[in-house]
Amino acid sequence: MKSTRPFHPTPVITIDGPTASGKGTVAALVAAHLGFHLLDSGALYRLAALASVRYGIAAEDIDALVKLIDDLHITFREGCAQLDGVDVSNDIRAEAVGNRASAIAVHGPVRSALVARQRAFRKTPGLVADGRDMGTVIFPDAVLKVFLTASAEARAARRHKQLMQKGFSANIDDLLRDLRERDARDSNRAAAPLKPAADAELLDTSALSVDEAVDQVLQWYRALGQPA
């Protein structure tokens, strides 16, 4: 194990990785096993965007957006994002919501408010946070940091299967191209580029089942002397 941090009364496990690496599913199952809270950081931005539309707040009204983010009632469970107690998992995937998320995230105070909300998810008995910069930016003191990797081909196949199961049509070659382009953007961006923390455990899930990936994360957690 790379981490030698002592027991933390409110431990955080971060699970970062590229698109379709399986981080969301693994994080949800680890959280369920440990009885920890769950944070889907990517969905948080979309939830704020959806709420801003529903409450009629303009994308340029920074003060109102910050207050909205501070007051949002958000809950994450396996495969489910709730806003004010209502499942909005499908609503936040709409293209218009994604566009609004991009529009509000350009404001520094809005980003700061969203970072604060992410950190506020750290509550007893613990938190599992998934995203792209959880271990490097949001929770640099996490007791366990995991960075999931997988080949672009494996991730494209997973995303294709997910879309087909939800009734959407998709071309696997297009998905593969899009993933590679996004990987390049995420890895080379100036602010918080997608990369593992120096003390992260690397987990290649290309040939692993979900259960195998979850078991490995739990093994690492137990090896730190943490109850699991």
Curated annotation (Swiss-Prot):
In short, the EC number is 2.7.4.25
Q: InterPro entries, per this entry?
A: Cytidylate_kin (IPR003136), Cytidylate_kinase_dom (IPR011994), P-loop_NTPase (IPR027417)
Question: Native species of this protein?
Answer: Burkholderia ambifaria (strain ATCC BAA-244 / DSM 16087 / CCUG 44356 / LMG 19182 / AMMD) (Burkholderia cepacia (strain AMMD))
Name the UniProt key words of this record, in alphabetical order: ATP-binding, Cytoplasm, Kinase, Nucleotide-binding, Transferase
Q: Where can this protein be found?
A: Cytoplasm
The UniProt entry, under SUPFAM superfamilies, shows: P-loop containing nucleoside triphosphate hydrolases
A biological process (GO) annotation for this entry?
nucleobase-containing small molecule interconversion
> What reactions does this protein catalyze?
CMP + ATP = CDP + ADP; dCMP + ATP = dCDP + ADP
Q: Which residues bind ATP?
A: 17-25
Protein name per UniProt: Cytidylate kinase
Q: Which GO terms describe its molecular function?
A: ATP binding; CMP kinase activity; dCMP kinase activity
Q: Output the Gene Ontology cellular-component terms.
A: cytosol
Q: Which domain of life is it from?
A: Bacteria
> What family classification does the UniProt entry report for this protein?
Belongs to the cytidylate kinase family. Type 1 subfamily.
